[in-house]
């Protein structure tokens, strides 16, 4: 039960949310959460009481894994979740307030907010996906984040930590926790973990097929043996478990997300086979991966926010589609330093015609030129799609370019 003050705070938040909607200023979840938090600073703790909560965090894949975990846990009962990805305090308050009676919760949480959010909601499970630099002007943060996560987990020894053992930094964050479920969820991007986060010495990597395929040359720190892993068709788990897993979402990275989602749900009592069936039904995440008709084109929309995310998203692109559009902005939420474009291997598209789009499409066009990729430049993303031959078009956009495209599509109806 929440206090009288909390009930008043939630009522005020609901009023603010309603006002935001009727005045056309947005869905109102954030402002509703902010108002409630302003009136009662303990509101998040009160809303989290009495629930079994999963906290999901990492640089990439948070929204997708949250959506999959919520689907898997939905087989056990009602689930409160921040499905639209508002992953800081106000968004979490709004999500929990909207589902007051749900005894289960799955919360996507920004990496730096995990410790104090965990202190408030006392999670039963914490899912650690991956850590890499999000923006070049924030490159130093990943080691700080790892240490912050490690310290935060130490305050919750009873939580089950579902950690990606292919990611050096997340493995370090979870390494000292007493209840860890290790998942081999993949770690194709290794540029941000060349040194051991514990000793500063080098990390040696072997082929993934070999045992201990990464280890530190300094501290006694190496890749743990996974409890869960996957291949193209099957998810493997404890005690010889092997379940067919054919996802609606593309890419190896999403099979890794699904493996961690299933492991988290099983930790809370879900039946593994039922959980796998549920995650396989997820076909869209807040507009990502969806296919929309735009005139004579069927456009599939992918989101990429940082070098690691771009590498994964570009790997999902069907190079044999009728058109490929890559849209890049350079606003503050994207990171204004776009030199990361030179870290992404666009050379894979040397036999594919690409349309460079977005406010920083010219920067992208220069990079594509050096990569030997045939390209044209059309700054408006919708116009870029229209410039492609009729048929299927693959669209990859960074954060604000993705939002602009979503708004443009909404206006078109």
Regions found by a protein language model. Give the residues of each.
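Buried hydrophobic packing segments
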Residues: 69, 73, 92-96, 258-268, ...
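Phosphate-binding loop of NTP-binding sites
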Residues: 4-182, 189, 195
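Residue-level signal for inorganic ion chemistry
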Residues: 108, 129, 162, 257, ...
């Amino acid at each position: 039960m929440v206090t009288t003050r909390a009930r008043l705070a939630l009522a005020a938040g609901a009023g603010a949310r309603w006002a935001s909607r009727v005045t056309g200023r947005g869905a109102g979840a954030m402002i509703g959460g902010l108002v409630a938090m302003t009136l009662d600073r303990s509101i998040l703790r009160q809303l989290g009481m009495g629930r079994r909560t999963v906290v999901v965090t990492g640089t990439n894949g948070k929204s997708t894994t949250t959506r999959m975990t919520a689907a898997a846990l939905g087989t056990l009962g009602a689930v409160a979740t921040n499905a639209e990805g508002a992953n800081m305090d106000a968004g979490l308050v709004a999500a929990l307030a909207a589902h007051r009676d749900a005894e289960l919760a799955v919360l996507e949480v920004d990496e730096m907010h995990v410790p104090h959010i965990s202190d408030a909601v006392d999670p039963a499970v914490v899912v650690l996906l991956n850590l890499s630099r999000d923006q070049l002007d924030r490159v130093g943060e990943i080691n700080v984040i790892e240490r912050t996560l490690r310290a935060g987990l130490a305050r919750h020894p009873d939580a089950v930590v579902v950690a990606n053992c292919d990611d050096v930094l997340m493995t370090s964050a979870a390494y000292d926790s007493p209840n860890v479920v290790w998942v081999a969820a993949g770690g194709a991007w290794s540029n941000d973990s060349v040194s051991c986060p514990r000793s500063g010495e080098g990390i040696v990597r072997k082929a993934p097929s070999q045992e201990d395929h990464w280890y530190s040359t300094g501290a006694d720190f190496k890749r743990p043996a996974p409890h869960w892993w996957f291949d193209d068709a099957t998810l493997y788990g404890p005690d010889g478990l092997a379940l067919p897993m054919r996802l609606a979402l593309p890419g190896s990275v999403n099979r890794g997300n699904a493996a961690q989602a299933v492991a988290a749900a099983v930790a809370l009592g879900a039946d593994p086979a039922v959980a796998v069936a549920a995650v396989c039904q997820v076909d869209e995440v807040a507009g990502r991966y969806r296919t929309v008709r735009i005139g004579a084109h069927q456009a599939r929309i992918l989101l990429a926010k940082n070098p690691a995310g771009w590498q994964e998203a570009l790997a999902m692109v069907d190079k044999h589609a009728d058109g490929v559009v890559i849209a890049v902005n350079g606003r503050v939420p994207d990171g204004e330093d776009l030199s990361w474009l030179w870290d992404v291997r666009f050379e894979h598209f040397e036999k594919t015609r690409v349309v460079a789009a977005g406010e920083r499409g010219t920067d992208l066009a220069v990079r594509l030129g050096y990569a030997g990729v045939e390209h044209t430049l059309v700054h408006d993303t919708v116009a870029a799609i229209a410039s492609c031959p009729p048929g299927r078009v693959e669209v990859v956009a960074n954060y604000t370019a993705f939002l602009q495209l979503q708004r443009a599509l909404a206006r078109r109806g």
